[in-house]
From Swiss-Prot:
PROSITE patterns in alphabetical order: EGF_1 (PS00022), EGF_2 (PS01186), EGF_3 (PS50026), VWFA (PS50234)
Source species of the chain: Dictyostelium discoideum
Keyword Disulfide bond: yes
Gene name linked to the record: sibA
Protein name: Integrin beta-like protein A
Sorted UniProt keywords: Cell adhesion, Disulfide bond, EGF-like domain, Glycoprotein, Membrane, Signal, Transmembrane, Transmembrane helix
Phylogenetic placement of the source organism: Eukaryota, Amoebozoa, Evosea, Eumycetozoa, Dictyostelia
First-listed, main subcellular location of the protein, grouped into a coarse class: membrane
Residues covered by the EGF-like domain: 425-462
Transmembrane regions listed in the UniProt entry: 1861-1881
Family that this chain belongs to: Belongs to the SIB family.
Disulfide bonds: C435-C450, C452-C461
C-alpha cells in the first residue's frame, strides 16, 4: 500500500511538471581566451520539452533550440542563447542543453583599473506548481572581471568557479536531507557557498548550506516542488550560481531499531515513537533507495583531469540491494564531447560508459551530475564529479625545447598557438582575404569577413560605392533592420524615392511572422464597474478565470491586465487601471463595484481611448488587445472617434468590445475603420460572455490590418487586410507601396512615416530623396614656376558621389589646369576624387589681383552652386637659362689657328652677374684649348657674360688621327642658381693630312756598260698608297732609263700606278738604267716625287755614278738583338750597320728600314729632341724605338744595308720587340652637383679615367665630408666617417632636413684602379637651393558625443617652421558651429587661426544617427594650412566629425493620470529607446504626495514585489515597462494629488545620458464613500456590570434564557454622522430583536420586524439594539444580526454582522460506587459491582470512560501482574492498553454503565490497590467553539486489598499453586466493605487533585476546576456537531 502511495505521488508530481511552465535548471561559468578581455562563457540549462513546438515530434541529443537572450553586461551586447541538447528525460519532460559564446570586451590598457561586468540570463517563467517563486522569472548570473594586470600568461588568469547539478533533486518530506553542491575552481581557489539573494528568488524556508563545504541541509514539510539557487564564489570575487528544483516526496521507510515501533513502515520521522537513535542523516524513518557504486563511478565531488587530443573514459554505475528491483541512471550535463559507448540500464546494477576525446575547443571544466531511480520509485542521492580539460602549453602546436611553441600554420607562437596570427581567422586560422578599405574579422573567433569602411563595398572592400543620383533610378530600399522580438519586420527601413512621378512605386515587403510559440501576447480587460444589472459584475468576477484560461490556450505566457470605467451619470469616470499588464484578473474587490446604474453616459469609446493611452505596462514587440466589457453602446463626437482610431493605430492595439446590450455604433465604427471586433453576449447571467470575448479576440487575430501613422503627405499606399492564422507558424508578406507624393509642398528633408499592422507592431520608414549638392570654394597658393596639385570639394546630404565641372578656367597667360597630364578645357567634367595640377605659365606670378576660375558639383541629377577658386602665385628667384650652340661643330682650318665663337645666357631677373660655368674640359685639353681672351678655360671655371654673351676662341694645337667632335657642357649661373639644365656646344678636332716623303738611295754607283735596277720609295703614315712621278730624267749620253719588265724606254714625266704602302713605306722598283763605257760621277740622274692623292712629297733626286768595271759583293746587315722594354719608355740606341767585303764600300754603307714597326715608331735624336727616323741613313744608322702610347705587347721592324753600288743584303734582318705593360694611375674629376629642396634624390657616380685600356674597374673612397650637405651610399646609408669606400662608386647628395636655406659645399674623393694605383684627390662642388615647401594639411576625424562640444587641433605641419603654422578656414560645418576657443567667436571663412584653437558644437540632437545607415561622419569643414611666411598654402584638409548618438530615451505616455478615491492606481512608465541607444533606464527624481508610490515587479500568478518610495531607483526596462502602484491616503482626493518627477536615461560606454525631466500628475477622483458600521460593545443580562468590547470575530456568547444589549456607531467620510440612518438588513429568524429603550422594562423598546427594520439613533449619538433568544434554546451560530447604514445619497454600507452563540451551562458528570472496598487473595478474581455514573445533560452523545488499576501512589499497574475484564465489551468502543491494566472506552452513558456493571479484577501479588474510574463528558453540552475547553469530568476509586494466601501446596499437573477457599472468601468480603465506604465518601464530596495527587491525571491536562480532569483528546467528533438542545 505504501509503495502504491509513493508511485501515485510521483505520478502526480510528474503530471504537475509536465503541465507547468518551462525553466528547470541553469548555471553559467566563464574563462579568459587568449587575452584578458576575451571571455568564453559556458552554460548548462534545463527546460520543459513540451514548451517548444519544435520538439513536438521528439527531442534528441544534438538538437538546437533558442531559449532566450544572454546579456553580456556591456550596455548593448545581447546574444541568442541557442542550446545544444545534451540529455533528454522523456519521463519527466525535461532536457538539458549546453551553450557557449566567446565575447571580447573593450580592452583596458596595462595598469588600468579592472572592470567588472555582470552577465545575466533571465526571462520568465519558472514552473507554476512551485511552492516558492511560482511562475517567477529565472535569473542566472555571473560576475566577470576584466583585468589587464594579470600578466601575459593566460593560463594563470582567473577563471570562474564551475558548477552543475541535475535539474530536479528528489528529497524526502519530513526527513532530514543533505546533498553536496557540485562545484570546482579551475584555479584551485577555495570556494564559499551561500544561498543566492538574486532578484525574484525566495529561498525555501528551512534550507541552509555549509558555507565552506557546500553541503545543503533541508527538511521539507510539504510535498511538492521548491526552487533554490546557490551562489559559489572564489577568493577573487568571481561568482557563479546554480539554480535547480527540489522535489519533496513522501517516501516510505522503516523506523529505526531504537524506536518503540522499530521496524515498522513509516512515511516520516513523526511515525516513529520513543526513538533513542537515528540514521546518519538524523532520521528515525529511513528508506533504502538505490546507491551509486564507487568506483567505477568517480567519487562524489572528485575532479578528473583530461588532456587535449587524448581519449578518456568514465562510467556511472548504480545498484539496488534488492534483487527484485532494477535501477535506471539519469545523467545531466554530459559534455557534447563525450560519447555514450555503452548503456546497460534497467538492471539490478546499471552502468553507463562514456568516451571523451576533448579538442582545444573543449577546454574548460564540466560538472556532471546523475541520480538513479529504482522501478518502485525510490530515488538515489545525487552524485557529481568534474572533468577538467586542461589547456596544453601550446594549443595548436608543439613545445619547443627550452621554451616557446612551434605552431601550426596560421597560429601565433607569442600567444602559445591559441590565437591566430594577424591576417588569419577561424578555428583553423586560415588566411583572411585582402581587405583593402576595411577591417577583417580576424582571430580564432573571427569569420574572416571584411567589414568595409563607409563608402566601400565588395568582398574585399575594394569597390567604391558610387551612389550617384540617377534621374532614371528606381525607388529602392537603402537600409532596414529586423528585431528578433518583433512580429512585424522590418521594424525600420530607409528608402530612396525618385521624385519623378513616372517611376513605379517602391514595394516594401513587410513580414508578419507567427512563431511556433506565441510568447509575447498582452491583453487589457476593461470592465464597466457600474453596470445597469449587478449580475454583469458578478459574472465577470466569477468567470474571469475562464477568460484567462482561454487566453492561455492562445499563448501560454499571455500577460493580462485589468482596467475599470464607469458610465454612470453620478461618479462616472473614463478609466482607472486596476491591474497592470502581467498581473492578471484575480483579486477584484466588491469595493470596486459601484451601485447599479440604469442611466449611462455611453462613454465606453472614451474609456477605451483612455485605456489605450494609459501606461498600463505594455511591452515592446507584443501583440496588444484591449477587451471592453460594457452594457451600453457608445456615443461620441467625430473628434473623439478620430482620436480613438488614431490612438489605437499609433499604439498598435486591437480593440474588442463585448456588449451585454446594444452595440450598433461599435459595429459600424469597426467596419468603417477596418479593424476591431464587437459581439453581443446572449446570456448576461452566465459565462457566455467568455466564449463571446474569446471568439472576438480570435476574430481580430485572424487578419492583419495596416494603417498609416504620420503620413500627412501621402507617401504610403497600404494593402487591404490579410487573412492570417496565429495557430500556424508562418510568415505573411504584407506589401507596402511607397512613392514620392506629387503636388505637395514643404516636404522636409528626410521625412519619416510609419505604418501599424494594428495589434502586431509598427514599422518606421525614413525617406530619402535627392537634394542639390554644395560646392566648396578653394584657394590655390603656389610659387612662380611651381606646379600645384589639388582636389576640389563638395558635399551632398544624400551621400551621392559627386562630379565637378569647370565653368571657367584660368587665362593661358596665368597657367593651365591639367588632369593626368592633359590640359582641361572649359566645360570638362571629372570625378570629385580627381587630383588636378595647376601649372603656372612660365615665370608668371601674381602682381596684384588674384586670378580665378569657377566650378560646380553635380550629383548626377542636379548642379550645385558655382564655387570660386582663387589663384595666387608668389614670385621666386628663377634659375637663369642658357642656350646651346646649334649647327655644325666649331672647327679650325689648321693647327694653332684660333677659331672665335660666343655663348649666350639669360635671366628673367636681368641679373648682371651671369657667368658661364664649364663642365669637364679634359677631352679638349689633350688636343687644344678654349680661351676667354688670353686665358685658357679649365674644368669648372667660369666666364662672365656681357649682355648675355661671352666671346671665346677655340684652338687645335695637336693633330688627330681622325676627325673627332667633342661636346662641351656648360651652365649659366646668376650668382645663386645654376640654370635648370645644362647647355652644350661642339668642337671638331680635324686631322690634317701629311704629304708623303720621297726617298731613295743616292748616289748610286754602276759599272760601265752595265744595268742598274733603281728603287724609289716614299713613306706616308696616313695614306694607303702613293703614285710616283718621274719628273726629270737626265742622261749623260749613251745611257738610257727603261722599264725593267718590258725594257720600254722611259721618258719624263712618267707616272706609276698607285703603289700600296706597307709598313708605312711604298717602293717602286721597275726603273732600270743602262750605263755606257764611261767613267764619271753624277753622269746621270732622275728626279721623282710621290703623291698620296691630296698632297705631293718634295722632289727627290737620285744621282748615278759610273765607275770602272769592278766586281761588287753585296753587303751583309748586322742583326740587332731582340729586346724588351717598358710601355712608356724609349729604347736604348739601336744601330743599323753591316759588313761589306768590298773595300771600296766599307764605311759607305747605308742603313735602310725595310719595314717600320706596327705599334711604335723609329726615332732619331738630334740633341735632346727626337724625331721620326728617315728610311735611309748612313751606317752605322743610330735609331731608337718608342711604342705607340699605351701600347704593350710585341712589335718588330725589318732593315738592311746597301752599298755604294746599290747592292743590298738580300736577306733583311728583323728585330722582335717585347713592350711590357706599365700601370698608370687613374685620374678623377667630379662634376658639380646643383640641387634644390624639391629635387628627388639622385644617385650620382664617380667616373675616374685611366689611360690604361685594360683598367675598367675602379673603387672610390670619400676622403672628406661636406660640411652641411649629407652624403650617402647608393643604399641610402649616411656616410659620417672618412675614409669610406663606395662599394659601387655611387653616392647620393641630400640636404639635412633641418636646413631651410641655400648653401654651397663640397666633398673630396679619390679612386683606385685594379692595381691599387690611386688617382688624384678630386673635389666635388655642391650647390643647394632651398625652395619653400608648402605646409601640409592632413584630414582628421574627431569623435564626440551628441549635444556636446569637442576642442581639437587641425592637423597641419610646416617643414620649415612647424610651430607657427596656421589654419585658414575654407568652408564651415553644415550641422554645427565652429568656434575659436581663445576668443569665443565663430570662425569665418578665409580667416586665419592657430591650429589648436578650435571648438566644434553640433546642432542640438544631431548625430551620426541622422546620416544614411547611421554612419558618420555627420559633419565636416575644410581648411588649408599657411606657413610662417604666409606666402604659400597647403592642400585642403578636412576635419570630419563623428558624432556618437547620445539620444536619451523619450517618454510618450500620459502626463496626467486619474484614479478613484480609495483605489490603488497601477501604472507603468515606458520609454522609447533614443536614436542610437539600446536601453531605457528610469530614475525617479522626486515624489510629492501624501499617498504612497510603490515600484512593483509582477511575475504572473506569483504576484508582485513592491518597493516603497522608489526615489533614485534605477530601473532597466528596455524590453518590459516598469510598473508602479500609487495608493492615495484613504478617503482623500483632489487634483495634483501626486506629482512624480522622473528622467529616462541610457548608458553609452558606461556614461549616463539623461532625458529631460518628465512629470506625471495623478488626480484622485472624489467618490462618494459608503458609510461604515462600527461595533462598539455589548452587555449580557447575566453580567449587567461587565461591558464586553467586540473582538475581531464580532461574536456575542450568551447563555440561554438571557438577553444582550448591543451598542454600535456609524461613520461616513463624506458626510456628518447626523445624516446617517441605520437599519437591520434582515431580522433574526430565532429570538426577538428590539430597539433599546432605557426607559422600557428590560430596555426592550420597539420590536424590529421585516417591515420595520429602522433603528433610531439614541440621544448619545449611538445606536442600541437588544436581542432575546427563544427561551430554553441554545446553539453555536444561533443567529446572525446584519446591521447597515445608509447615507443621504443612498449609498449603503457594507453590512456588519453580529454572530450570537447561545449556550447551556454544562453540568458535570458524577460517579456512584455502592461498595468502595474489596479484599481478596492474590490470583483470585475480585468481582466489582455497583459502579455507575451519570451526566445529567447528556443523552445520546459519547462520553469517555477510563478504568485503570493503580497503586497507592497512583501509578498504573502493569498488566503482567494484574488484569481485569469488563462485561459487554462488544457494545462499546474500548481500547486496552498494551502494557498496563487500563481500558479506555467511548460510547453513550447507557452503554458504558452496562459495561461496568460487573468488573473482574485479578492480581497475582499482594498489596493495596485502587480501581480508578474516570468519566469525561467531552464538553458536548457546550457550544462547539468552546467545547474542547469546557470538558467536565468526575473521578472515583474502588479500594482493593489483596493478600498472599498461606499456601498449602498441592501438586497439580499444571504446577499451579491454588489458594484455599477461605482466603478467597475473606478477600471477597473485604472488597464489599471497601465498596460501601467509598460510596459514602463520594456522596459527601467529589475527590480532588489534592486527594489523589498528580498521578491520577497523568494521561491528560487538568482544567481550571480541580474537580475536572480534561481529556487528552482535543479533536471534535464530527458525528456530534449539534446544538445542546438535542442532547
Amino acid at each position: 500500500m505504501n509503495r502504491i502511495l509513493t508511485l501515485f505521488i510521483l505520478f502526480i508530481s510528474l503530471f504537475i511538471v509536465c503541465e507547468a511552465t518551462h525553466f528547470r535548471f541553469g548555471t553559467m561559468s566563464w574563462m579568459p581566451m587568449g587575452s584578458h578581455n576575451t571571455i568564453k562563457f559556458s552554460s548548462n540549462y534545463a527546460f520543459r520539452i513540451g514548451f517548444f513546438k519544435k520538439f513536438n515530434k521528439g527531442c534528441n541529443v544534438g538538437d538546437v533550440v533558442k531559449v532566450g537572450d544572454l546579456d553580456l553586461g556591456d550596455d548593448k551586447t545581447k546574444v541568442d542563447v541557442n542550446l545544444v541538447v545534451t540529455s533528454v528525460n522523456q519521463a519527466d519532460d525535461w532536457f538539458t542543453g549546453e551553450f557557449s559564446y566567446t565575447h571580447t570586451y573593450n580592452p583596458i590598457k596595462l595598469g588600468g583599473k579592472a572592470v567588472t561586468y555582470k552577465v545575466v540570463f533571465t526571462d520568465c517563467c519558472r514552473i507554476k506548481s512551485l511552492l516558492n517563486n511560482a511562475e517567477g522569472s529565472w535569473y542566472i548570473s555571473t560576475s566577470v572581471v576584466v583585468d589587464p594586470n594579470q600578466g601575459s600568461d593566460v593560463s594563470t588568469f582567473n577563471r570562474s568557479p564551475v558548477s552543475g547539478m541535475v535539474p530536479i533533486i528528489t528529497l524526502n518530506r519530513d526527513k532530514n536531507n543533505q546533498f553536496l553542491i557540485a562545484a570546482s575552481d579551475p584555479n584551485g581557489d577555495t570556494l564559499t557557498y551561500s544561498l543566492s539573494n538574486a532578484y525574484t528568488m525566495n529561498q525555501p524556508s528551512g534550507l541552509s548550506i555549509d558555507s565552506s563545504k557546500g553541503i545543503v541541509s533541508f527538511k521539507p514539510t510539504v510535498s511538492g516542488f521548491y526552487s533554490t539557487q546557490i551562489m559559489i564564489k572564489d577568493t577573487k570575487g568571481a561568482y557563479v550560481v546554480v539554480d535547480f528544483l527540489i522535489n519533496s516526496v513522501i517516501e516510505p521507510g522503516v523506523c529505526h531499531p531504537s524506536c518503540s515501533n522499530g521496524g515498522n513502515t513509516c512515511n516520516g520521522n513523526s511515525g516513529c515513537k520513543s526513538c533513542k537513535g537515528t540514521d546518519s542523516n538524523g532520521n528515525t524513518c529511513s528508506s533504502f533507495p538505490p546507491v551509486f557504486v564507487y568506483p567505477p563511478t568517480p567519487t562524489d565531488g572528485s575532479l578528473l583531469a583530461y588532456e587535449v587530443n587524448k581519449t578518456n573514459s568514465f562510467s556511472i554505475q548504480c545498484k539496488t540491494e534488492e534483487k527484485s528491483k532494477t535501477v535506471f541512471i539519469q545523467p545531466a550535463n554530459i559534455p557534447l564531447a563525450a560519447t555514450l559507448t555503452s548503456s546497460d540500464q534497467n538492471k539490478q546494477v546499471s552502468t553507463l560508459t562514456y568516451s571523451m576525446l576533448p579538442q582545444l575547443k573543449h577546454i574548460g571544466v564540466y560538472v556532471i551530475s546523475a541520480y538513479c531511480t529504482d522501478n518502485k520509485g525510490l530515488v538515489s542521492t545525487i552524485t557529481s564529479f568534474s572533468i577538467s580539460v586542461e589547456k596544453p602549453i601550446c594549443g595548436h602546436g608543439t613545445n619547443k625545447p627550452g621554451g616557446g611553441c612551434n605552431c601550426e600554420t596560421g597560429w601565433d607562437p607569442e600567444k602559445n598557438c591559441y590565437e591566430c596570427l594577424k591576417g588569419h581567422y577561424g578555428e583553423k586560422c586560415d588566411p583572411v582575404d585582402p581587405c583593402v578599405n576595411g577591417e577583417s574579422n580576424e582571430g580564432s573567433q573571427g569569420n574572416g569577413k571584411c567589414t568595409c569602411y563607409y563608402g566601400w563595398e565588395g568582398k574585399n572592400c575594394d569597390i567604391k560605392v558610387n551612389q550617384v543620383c540617377n534621374a532614371n533610378k528606381e525607388n529602392v530600399v537603402l537600409d532596414s533592420s529586423v528585431a528578433k522580438s518583433s512580429y512585424i519586420n522590418p521594424n525600420f527601413a530607409q528608402v530612396y524615392l525618385n521624385t519623378d512621378p513616372s517611376k513605379q512605386a517602391l514595394t516594401l515587403s513587410s513580414k508578419l511572422s507567427i512563431p511556433e510559440t506565441i510568447d509575447k501576447f498582452e491583453v487589457l480587460v476593461l470592465v464597466d464597474s457600474q453596470p445597469s444589472i449587478v449580475e454583469y459584475w458578478d459574472n465577470f468576477k466569477k468567470y474571469s478565470s475562464d477568460l484567462t484560461k482561454n487566453l492561455q490556450d492562445i499563448s501560454e505566457t499571455v500577460s493580462i491586465g485589468l482596467g475599470l470605467f464607469s458610465d454612470a451619470k453620478t461618479n462616472g469616470y473614463s478609466f482607472v487601471l486596476k491591474k497592470s499588464i502581467g498581473n492578471g484578473l484575480s483579486g477584484l474587490d466588491d469595493k470596486d463595484k459601484a451601485p447599479a446604474s440604469s442611466y449611462s453616459t455611453k462613454n465606453s469609446l472614451i474609456a477605451l481611448t483612455s485605456a489605450a493611452e494609459f501606461p498600463a505596462g505594455w511591452s515592446t514587440g507584443s501583440i496588444k488587445i484591449i477587451v471592453l466589457l460594457t452594457d451600453n453602446d457608445y456615443s461620441a463626437t467625430a473628434q473623439e472617434v478620430s482620436k480613438f482610431t488614431s490612438t489605437l493605430i499609433s499604439k498598435s492595439i486591437l480593440p474588442v468590445v463585448v456588449s451585454f446590450n446594444d452595440n450598433q455604433n461599435w459595429d459600424t465604427l469597426f467596419k468603417n475603420q477596418g479593424f476591431g471586433s464587437t459581439k453581443k453576449t446572449s446570456n448576461a447571467k452566465g459565462n457566455d460572455w467568455v466564449s463571446v470575448a474569446t471568439s472576438a479576440i480570435k476574430d481580430v487575430l485572424s487578419k492583419a490590418v495596416v494603417k498609416a501613422i504620420d503620413d500627412t503627405k501621402g507617401f504610403l499606399t497600404l494593402p487591404s487586410a490579410t487573412t492570417i492564422s496565429i495557430e500556424d507558424s508562418k510568415d505573411y508578406t504584407i506589401p507596402i507601396q511607397i512613392k514620392y507624393p506629387q503636388g505637395q509642398s514643404d516636404i522636409p528633408q528626410n521625412p519619416s512615416v510609419s505604418y501599424s499592422v494594428v495589434g502586431f507592431g509598427i514599422t518606421r520608414i525614413v525617406i530619402n530623396y535627392n537634394s542639390a549638392p554644395t560646392a566648396l570654394g578653394y584657394s590655390i597658393e603656389t610659387k612662380q614656376n611651381v606646379n600645384y596639385n589639388f582636389k576640389l570639394s563638395g558635399s551632398d546630404v544624400d551621400g551621392n558621389t559627386l562630379t565637378i565641372k569647370f565653368k571657367t578656367i584660368p587665362a593661358a597667360s596665368v597657367g593651365v589646369i591639367q588632369a593626368d597630364g592633359v590640359t582641361i578645357e572649359q566645360g570638362d567634367s571629372f570625378s570629385i576624387e580627381k587630383t588636378f595640377t595647376f601649372k603656372p605659365a612660365t615665370n608668371y606670378y601674381t602682381k596684384s589681383t588674384n586670378d580665378k576660375f569657377t566650378f560646380v558639383a553635380n550629383d548626377g541629377c542636379l548642379d550645385s552652386n558655382e564655387a570660386t577658386v582663387e589663384i595666387k602665385i608668389t614670385h621666386v628667384n628663377q634659375a637663369p637659362s642658357c642656350s646651346s650652340l646649334s649647327g655644325s661643330a666649331i672647327s679650325v682650318t689648321g693647327l694653332n689657328t684660333p677659331k672665335s665663337f660666343s655663348l649666350q645666357g639669360s635671366d628673367i631677373e636681368t641679373d648682371s652677374n651671369l657667368k658661364i660655368v664649364f663642365g669637364d674640359l679634359t677631352a679638349i685639353s689633350a688636343y687644344g684649348n678654349i680661351k676667354s681672351g688670353s686665358n685658357v678655360v679649365s674644368t669648372g671655371s667660369s666666364v662672365q657674360l656681357s649682355s648675355g654673351s661671352a666671346s671665346l676662341t677655340f684652338t687645335q694645337t695637336k693633330d688627330i688621327a681622325n676627325d673627332k667632335e667633342i661636346t662641351v657642357d656648360f651652365k649659366v649661373n646668376d650668382g645663386s642658381l645654376d640654370s635648370s639644365s645644362s647647355c652644350s656646344f661642339k668642337v671638331k678636332f680635324v686631322h690634317f693630312n701629311k704629304p708623303p716623303v720621297a726617298f731613295a738611295v743616292t748616289p748610286l754607283t754602276i759599272r760601265q756598260n752595265s744595268e742598274l735596277k733603281i728603287t724609289i720609295s716614299a713613306s706616308d703614315s696616313d695614306s694607303d698608297s702613293v703614285i710616283f712621278t718621274l719628273d726629270d730624267l737626265k742622261l749623260g749620253g749613251g745611257d738610257s732609263f727603261f722599264k725593267c719588265d718590258d725594257r720600254s724606254q722611259l721618258t719624263a714625266p712618267f707616272t706609276t700606278q698607285p703603289v700600296s704602302i706597307s709598313g708605312g713605306v711604298a717602293s717602286f722598283s721597275e726603273i732600270c738604267y743602262s750605263s755606257p763605257l764611261v767613267n764619271a760621277n753624277s753622269y746621270a740622274s732622275l728626279v721623282f716625287f710621290a703623291n698620296d692623292g691630296q698632297l705631293s712629297s718634295d722632289k727627290f733626286k737620285v744621282l748615278i755614278n759610273i765607275n770602272g768595271d769592278r766586281p761588287n759583293a753585296p753587303p751583309v746587315v748586322n742583326q740587332i738583338p731582340n729586346f724588351t722594354m717598358n710601355e712608356d719608355d724609349i729604347s736604348n740606341e739601336l744601330v743599323i750597320d753591316g759588313i761589306d767585303p768590298d773595300e771600296l764600300d766599307q764605311g759607305k754603307l747605308k742603313g735602310i728600314i725595310i719595314q717600320k714597326p706596327t705599334n711604335g715608331v723609329i726615332l732619331v735624336k738630334s740633341g735632346s729632341s727626337t724625331s721620326e727616323a728617315p728610311i735611309i741613313g748612313n751606317a752605322p744608322y743610330k735609331i731608337f724605338y718608342k711604342p705607340n702610347p699605351l701600347y704593350y705587347g710585341t712589335d718588330s721592324f725589318s732593315y738592311t744595308v746597301e752599298d755604294s753600288m746599290g747592292e743590298r743584303d738580300a736577306t733583311p734582318k728583323t728585330t722582335q720587340i717585347t713592350v711590357q705593360h706599365v700601370n698608370h694611375a687613374p685620374t678623377l674629376s667630379i662634376d658639380p652637383y646643383d640641387f634644390t629642396s624639391q629635387t628627388s634624390e639622385k644617385t650620382l657616380e664617380l667616373t675616374p679615367k685611366d689611360i690604361d685600356l685594360i683598367d675598367t674597374v675602379f673603387h672610390c673612397t670619400i676622403v672628406k665630408l661636406p660640411a652641411t650637405a649629407i652624403i650617402k651610399t647608393s643604399a641610402g646609408k649616411v656616410i659620417d666617417t672618412v675614409p669610406t669606400d663606395l662599394s659601387d662608386n655611387k653616392y647620393i647628395i641630400t640636404s639635412n632636413n633641418n636646413i631651410y636655406n641655400d648653401f654651397s659645399d663640397s666633398f673630396d674623393a679619390k679612386c683606385y684602379d685594379s692595381s691599387n694605383a690611386v688617382s688624384n684627390i678630386a673635389t666635388g662642388p655642391i650647390t643647394f637651393r632651398y625652395i619653400n615647401v608648402p605646409p601640409k594639411a592632413e584630414s582628421s576625424d574627431e569623435t564626440l558625443n551628441q549635444d556636446s562640444s569637442v576642442s581639437f587641433s587641425v592637423k597641419a605641419t610646416d617643414l620649415e617652421d612647424n610651430s607657427n603654422v596656421r589654419a585658414v578656414i575654407r568652408s564651415l560645418p553644415a550641422k554645427g558651429t565652429l568656434t575659436i576657443k581663445s576668443t569665443g567667436k565663430a570662425a569665418e571663412i578665409s580667416s586665419t587661426y592657430a591650429i589648436d584653437d578650435f571648438v566644434y558644437t553640433p546642432v542640438a540632437g544631431y548625430s551620426n544617427w541622422d546620416k544614411p545607415g547611421h554612419v558618420g561622419p555627420a559633419d565636416s569643414f575644410n581648411f588649408v594650412a599657411k606657413d610662417s611666411k604666409n606666402d604659400i598654402s597647403s592642400n585642403i584638409g578636412t576635419v570630419s566629425f563623428f558624432i556618437e548618438p547620445r539620444n536619451p530615451p523619450t517618454y510618450e505616455g500620459l502626463a496626467v493620470l486619474y484614479t478613484k478615491e480609495n483605489t490603488d492606481l497601477p501604472f507603468s512608465i515606458s520609454g522609447i529607446v533614443g536614436n542610437g541607444g539600446s536601453n531605457v533606464f528610469l530614475r525617479i527624481k522626486s515624489i510629492v504626495s501624501r499617498g504612497s508610490l510603490y515600484a512593483t515587479h509582477c511575475m504572473g500568478t506569483e504576484g508582485c514585489m513592491s518597493e516603497p518610495n522608489p526615489v533614485d531607483i534605477n530601473i532597466n526596462f528596455t524590453s518590459q515597462p516598469y510598473t508602479f502602484s500609487f495608493t492615495p491616503i484613504e478617503y482623500e482626493n483632489g487634483d495634483n494629488y501626486a506629482i512624480i518627477e522622473f528622467v529616462l536615461y541610457d548608458k553609452f560606454n558606461g556614461q549616463e545620458v539623461e532625458s529631460q525631466k518628465y512629470t506625471i500628475i495623478i488626480n484622485v477622483i472624489p467618490v462618494n464613500q459608503a458609510p461604515e458600521v462600527i461595533l462598539i460593545e455589548h452587555t449580557l443580562s447575566t453580567l449587567p456590570n461587565n461591558v464586553i468590547a467586540f473582538d475581531k470575530f464580532k461574536t456575542v456568547k450568551m447563555e440561554t434564557n438571557s438577553y444582550v444589549i448591543i451598542k454600535y456607531d456609524g461613520t461616513d467620510i463624506d458626510d456628518p454622522k447626523e445624516k446617517l440612518k441605520s437599519y437591520i438588513v434582515s431580522p433574526p429568524l430565532r429570538g426577538l430583536l428590539y430597539v433599546y429603550d432605557k426607559d422600557a422594562k428590560d430596555g426592550l423598546g420597539k420590536l424590529i420586524k421585516k417591515d420595520d427594520t429602522f433603528v433610531p439613533v439614541a440621544q448619545d449619538g449611538f445606536w442600541y439594539i437588544v436581542f432575546v433568544p427563544t427561551p430554553g434554546s441554545s446553539g453555536d451560530g444561533y443567529v446572525r444580526i446584519p446591521i447597515s447604514m445608509v447615507d443621504f445619497l443612498g449609498d449603503i454600507s457594507v453590512p456588519v454582522t453580529v454572530a450570537v452563540d447561545v449556550s447551556k451551562k454544562n453540568i458535570p458528570p458524577f460517579i456512584t460506587i455502592e461498595n468502595k472496598n474489596y479484599t481478596s487473595l492474590a490470583n483470585t478474581s475480585i468481582v466489582v459491582t455497583g459502579v455507575s455514573f451519570d451526566d445529567p445533560d447528556s443523552k445520546y452523545n459519547d462520553v469517555e470512560l477510563i478504568l485503570s488499576l493503580v497503586n497507592k501512589d497512583g501509578d498504573l499497574v502493569s498488566n503482567k501482574i494484574a488484569t481485569f475484564s469488563l462485561s459487554q465489551q462488544s457494545k462499546a468502543k474500548c481500547t486496552k492498553h498494551s502494557e498496563f491494566a487500563q481500558f479506555t472506552c467511548r460510547s453513550n452513558k447507557k452503554t458504558l454503565n452496562a459495561l461496568i456493571s460487573t468488573m473482574y479484577v485479578n492480581h497475582q501479588g499482594g498489596g493495596s490497590y485502587r480501581l480508578k474510574v474516570f468519566v469525561n463528558d467531552l464538553g458536548y453540552s457546550s457550544p462547539a467553539s468552546i467545547r474542547d475547553k469546557n470538558h467536565m469530568t468526575a473521578t472515583d476509586y474502588v479500594e482493593l486489598d489483596v493478600t498472599k494466601p498461606e499456601v498449602t501446596t498441592t501438586k497439580e499437573n499444571n504446577n499451579k499453586t491454588v489458594l484455599t477457599g477461605a482466603i478467597a472468601g475473606a478477600a471477597a468480603g473485604a472488597g464489599l466493605l471497601a465498596a460501601g465506604a467509598w460510596f459514602l465518601l463520594k456522596k459527601s464530596a467529589p475527590p480532588t487533585d489534592a486527594f489523589f495527587g498528580e498521578g491520577a491525571f497523568a494521561d491528560g491536562a487538568v482544567s481550571t476546576n480541580p474537580m475536572y480532569e480534561e481529556s487528552g483528546r482535543s479533536a471534535i467528533n464530527p458525528l456530534y456537531e449539534a446544538s445542546s438542545e438535542n442532547l
